[in-house]
Amino acid sequence: MDIQNIKETIAMIEEQNFDIRTITMGISLLDCIDADIDKAAEKIYQKIVNKAGKLVEVGNEIGHELGIKIVNKRVSVTPIAIIGAATAADDYTPLALAMDRAAKEIGIDFIGGYSALVQKGYQKGDEILIKSMPKALAATERVCASVNVGSTKSGINMTAVRDMGETIKIMSKGDKWLNAKLVVFANAVEDNPFMAGAFHGVGEADTIINVGVSGPGVVKRALEKVRGESFDILAETIKKTAFKITRIGQLVGQMASERLNVEFGIVDLSLAPTPAIGDSVARVLEEMGLETVGTHGTTAALAMLNDAVKKGGVMAAERVGGLSGAFIPVSEDEGMIAAVNSGALNIEKLEAMTCVCSVGLDMIAIPEETPASTIAAMIADEAAIGVINQKTTAVRIIPMGKEGEQIEFGGLFGVAPVMRVNKASSADFIARGGQIPAPIHSFKN
């Protein structure tokens, strides 16, 4: 084995903020369906505790053995709207409480799956879940929610988009954490290990392990060694670095699945930043030659980074999936926060960047007076980007405070500067409701 590769791997862990961001166990709750919501809640609690009871212990063991920090151990479950639909209940909060109780029992920080898939319309459980979302998220500490409002095959459910704008607005009157735990998707994936948007798809195995890695600091350090070189060398350097990062994720996932006796799912190839210095996707883009993120060239730099990460990572993992690419959350990235505060980065540029990367408008604070119709229109724009380009896009926004203020979350969630939003109205557009049809290129059969 090449000694230089060993040295580089040690440096990744000790000096460059490399870590495994999450080991996420996906658990099917289809066998927990019951006409009695209280019985369903108890079944949900029991299954999560039985399946994931040793998840934290095993994750800590593996981290200690390999000398790698495994930051989060998490669980995702079948979209709760599917489970709740079998009951006569008009509020699914008891199911969220069961999830929360199980999460506390097994010692995980978040559990995802208080979710609904409504890309082509509402079923009985979907509307109930969305209406109960403000109450359910307020009543729980660790439950995360998501709603898929569009897909390339189905188009965009604009009625659901309107409803989600109103839901986010309602939740903004409560704790700042409520909207930090809600993601609105287009083309949501079934094997996402990252919160808050993780849920366990109905096409997945009963129980699986998915892994998400984090390595912006490692990529930046590698690029520092090729300053001034051509884009060809830049891309090759990112690919080689992504291979090393993903290889460790593959190893951790295999070890976890063997010890928990659970099928191994995927490694998510995403570069996930944190607010820590040296762990920023924005600083990687600036290392490519941009004075600051948000200037002209930012979208091209991000596109190349995203593509090179995928090309390098796909060779290192048995199976890849999830969101896979570079995350650009504002509050969770020290470089993004700095760019917003300097005036170099605005929501319009962030929207352009989402055309070429993994997710969307993520962890962005907007003024609290922003109307629900404007929030819905922002969701519609992101959904359109995803649907037309056959990729996952999402919105996680926090209406709070006044433009220019800083919303302090702390920990991995960081600080969100309140960003300017276009004040022109989209109300009549959003009021239409109905369905934006699927694009012509979605028709492939």
Swiss-Prot record:
InterPro entries tied to this protein: UPF0210
Signal peptide start-end: none
Highest taxon listed in the record's lineage: Bacteria
PANTHER family: UPF0210 PROTEIN MJ1665, UPF0210 PROTEIN SPR0218
Quaternary structure (record): Homodimer.
Family: Belongs to the UPF0210 family.
Protein name in the entry: UPF0210 protein LACR_1020
Organism, as annotated: Lactococcus lactis subsp. cremoris (strain SK11)
